[in-house]
Amino acid sequence: MFKILLVCALAALVAANENAEVKELVNEVNPDGFKTVVSLSDGSASQASGDVHGNIDGVFEWVSPEGVHVRVAYKADENGYQPSSDLLPVAPPIPEAILKSLAWIEAHPSKE
């Protein structure tokens, strides 16, 4: 299922800009995993590699309409999809009062 999603994402990347030319296209499928690379003349690119256990590491990037270079690296494994990028939002730190409450709850477990 994930391979179908990956192929669709690559097709969408290629179709995103009709004027962009494919600079590099690699699709290797081996008994121990796969590797795919797509690079377009407009700066868009996608790379992914996976193993027989379903673990996938990859990166995709493009230049936004504002001229900002966007790059997202990801890992997909038994823990799910884990993207990382400077442009992704980051949760605020947990307030000190909540941390103290959690510590108190841990130190005083329910009697049930």
Swiss-Prot record:
It comes from the Eukaryota. Residues 31-92 form the Chitin-binding type R&R domain. The keyword Aminoacyl-tRNA synthetase does not apply. The keyword Signal applies. Residues 1-16 form the signal peptide. GO terms for cellular component: chitin-based extracellular matrix. GO terms for molecular function: structural constituent of chitin-based larval cuticle. Keywords: Cuticle, Signal. Component of the larval cuticle. This is Larval cuticle protein III/IV. It comes from Drosophila miranda (Fruit fly). The gene is Lcp3.
